[in-house]
Amino acid sequence: MTKGRLEAFSDGVLAIIITIMVLELKVPEGSSWASLQPILPRFLAYIFSFIYVGIYWNNHHHLFQTVKKVNGSILWANLHLLFWLSLMPIATEWIGTSHFAQNPVATYGIGLIMSAIAYTILENVIIRCEGENSKLKEAIHSKFKEYISIIFYVLGIATSFFYPYIAIGFYYLVALIWLIPDKRIEKSLKEN
């Protein structure tokens, strides 16, 4: 499989994930502003998840700018990431319909941490396949953002059982960290 085909497949899966999430939003029953109130938790959950999917799509794009060719290991690592991201519509709907209850917020966090781990695995597989001359290895020599994200996810999951809104705050902090695209890869590609 070519790199372009893998990227197109991934883009398609991510687009479907967003489509599924937006289709879960229901039209309000009334015509007043007050009729929006019942769907507000689901809408907020959708916005949050949309941002996360967008972050992964953006970083996936940057990640594959460094890749020259793909092999079976990269394909499977990429599918592993897409698997965890594909569960996001379920978790999104659950936290929205439960109004951010404890177990749904914990489950959402587990999905986020598993997606982060899968993304890190994908990075490592690409580096291993590219060898010592890996542009990705050169670009991401520091993994501070990755490590702090995992710590915040763990804190969020642990906190979710007592204070689910604080847990959402931890997940929100991770999104803020990654909202600005990681410039390490672009910088490394320009230097080479």
From Swiss-Prot:
The chain crosses the membrane at residues 1-24, 40-65, 72-93, 102-126, 134-162, 165-180. It catalyses: K(+)(in) = K(+)(out). Residues 26-39, 94-101, 163-164 are extracellular. Residues 25, 66-71, 127-133, 181-192 are cytoplasmic. The record marks I16 as: Hydrophobic filter residue 1. It is found in: Membrane. GO terms for cellular component: membrane. Keywords: Ion channel, Ion transport, Membrane, Potassium, Potassium channel, Potassium transport, Transmembrane, Transmembrane helix, Transport. Residues 31-37 are annotated as: Short helix H2. InterPro entries: TMEM175-like. It is a multi-pass membrane protein. A motif (RxxxFSD motif) lies at residues 5-11. Residues 26-29 are annotated as: Short helix H1. Belongs to the TMEM175 family. Homotetramer. The six transmembrane regions are tightly packed within each subunit without undergoing domain swapping. Transmembranes TM1-TM3 are positioned on the inner circle of the channel tetramer and participate in inter-subunit interactions that are central to the assembly of the ion conduction pore. The RxxxFSD motif within transmembrane TM1 coordinates a network of specific inter- and intra-subunit interactions with other conserved residues on TM2 and TM3 and plays a key role in the tetrameric assembly of the channel. This is Potassium channel HX13_20290. It comes from Chryseobacterium sp. (strain P1-3).
